[in-house]
Amino acid sequence: MESLSLIFISFITLIVFLVVSASKKRSHPSGYEPDIPKGGCPMLDSTAYLVLSSPTNTAVTSTGIITSNPENIEHVLKTNFANYPKGEHLTYGLYDLLGRGIFNSDGDHWKLQRKIASLEFNTRTIRHFVTHDVSREVLDRLLPSLSRAANSGEIIDLQEVLDRLAFDNVCKIAFDDDPARLADKKFNDGENDYYGKFAKAFGEAAEISTQRFEKSRWKIARALNLGTERKMKNALAIVNEFAMQVVREMKRKRAEEGKGRGSSADLLSLFISEGEFSDEFLRDVVISFVLAGRDTTSSTMAFFFWQVSTRPSICQKIKEEIVSVRKNHNNSQGGAFTLEELREMDYLHAVLSETLRLYPIVPLHARYTLADDVLPDGTMVKKGSTVMHSIYAMGRMESIWGADCLEFRPERWLENGVFRPKSPFLFPVFLAGPRMCLGKETAYMQMKAVAASVMEKFKIEVADGKHESEREYYLEIVLRLKGGLPVRVTEKEWSDNSAVNV
């Protein structure tokens, strides 16, 4: 989850950088000319072109420094970590929404929240979350939803379905609540839909928060309650009321159960049991972890299904692995996967990692510089500068991934059929160093549970007829498929052999 700490900052810094860059004529170095295809996300591709055109994979711009050099990234995220916080000037615009939550704070305030949150992400908690909460959501809601789509023949937006699944899951692990948004058979949000109103308001508040970095006069607009700041005020009212209601309800439950954490195994109850925190502090906890899990896994899964649905050979190998794992555990009945079964799915793990390599959910990160510094590649960094690192560009570097770096090839992650991870400084999708993602394993297990369950029973076909090169994606808090992912679902009866039929 910590990998999302600069998600808003990254997006806006990128936009500002590109606007400035576009207003000036730039000449690229005469050396390496990266073969990055047009389309996809022009902003990200333009930025990647800039840093990959540099011999050191670092570019100095009018808005700061942007790099995809692994040594530089290790320096910023680990070696000289103390010199590169988020910084108040990068977090102020996000304060109305995020407060001083873990993803919008530095120093002791951040350390305290990370220390408490780290207690949640242990093997016992992951096992319960995956085998109980995620499995129930998949078996009782996701698979029936896909079955209805298969039986009716309707085309559904799989990205929307996955969004609802992720929202239900994050509410469970963050504050032990079940919105049941995936249970709505028609996926309609009525005017009285409490959770639907919050989800919509949260999205609006997040979008406007990012736009603030583009508008020099947003503070005046906020004071006068004008334009998007009026919309922001209304959205925040809904978001804050939701979060405070969650806090009040959790405190009520805790009072009934007595001192200690009680029966809940969620993040909010953990924070309440660990100290006497104000309601405002706990409100920031709720919002921060909704941010962390709201669209992240769902968007990654949308990119995953887009990629495998257009690659029958990869789809076949995943299904063969599912059959093999089932047999190894003498499980011929289907149903929920155990944590042990999911951990044995090396090829599926490789496909998910390959998805994240080419389509990192947080494609850029940014840091503020406290004191003058020199990066390992010799780049001078002045105090007060912003240093961005492009995860998107790193996934397209021949020096890391080879000449076929633009190809979707999961086998690059395997050695004799066993998954072999890369250094987090070569693959910083989950960040690295002291702020490395706490929920990395949880995210992988959750995604594997969803992917394996769906692919074991269904065939997913992209239904809009777009060629892969025509598929557009964009930044909206996280990397998203533009227009969603319209798919046609075909259901198959499960058996030892049927799972290998594409």
Curated annotation (Swiss-Prot):
One of the Pfam families matching this protein, by short name: p450
Tissue: Mainly expressed in leaves and, at low levels, in roots, fruits and stems.
Binding positions (heme): 437
Primary site of residence: membrane
Subcellular location: Membrane
GO biological process: cholesterol metabolic process; saponin biosynthetic process; steroid biosynthetic process
Domain of life: Eukaryota
Xref: InterPro entries: Cyt_P450, Cyt_P450_E_grp-IV, Cyt_P450_sf
Function: Involved in the biosynthesis of spiroketal steroid and saponin natural products from cholesterol such as diosgenin and analogs (e.g. furostanol and spirostanol), plant defense compounds used as main precursors for the industrial production of steroid hormones. During the 5,6-spiroketalization of cholesterol, may catalyze the 27-monohydroxylation of furostanol-type steroid to an intermediate product that undergoes a stereospecific formation of the terminal heterocycle to yield diosgenin.
Protein name: Cytochrome P450 CYP94D109
